[in-house]
Amino acid sequence: MSACACSHHHAHHDCGRPDPVGAQVALSGEITCADMGQLMALLTHVEAHVAASRAEPGCLFFEIAQTDDPLVWRVEELFRDAAALEAHRARTKTSSWAAATSGIPRQIREIMAQGDVVPAG
């Protein structure tokens, strides 16, 4: 990753996320801001969201990083199991991150250890 003019780090590919093994579940994808307003909402909340997510007991890897396009952010997550992912979703559902970024489109897929890929919901 490289720092951009706004001093954030840009993501390339999987941001170093390990492949899931056993019962682990990974999420991979992008958040695409439509305009500077959405970008500012994301920038305001992303650091706290990443820190809170990384502090969750079932979180093994969590990265949201800006790509070369300042409006597009790479998302890579890895959780111990499906229950840990559900706990993460429950926490974020009522978070300031969710409130501030709910209108920003996400293209996220769920990756199981067996290589199955399904749309994340």
Residue spans for each PLM region:
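Short, well-ordered beta-strand segments in beta-rich or mixed alpha/beta enzyme
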Residues: 25-32, 63-91
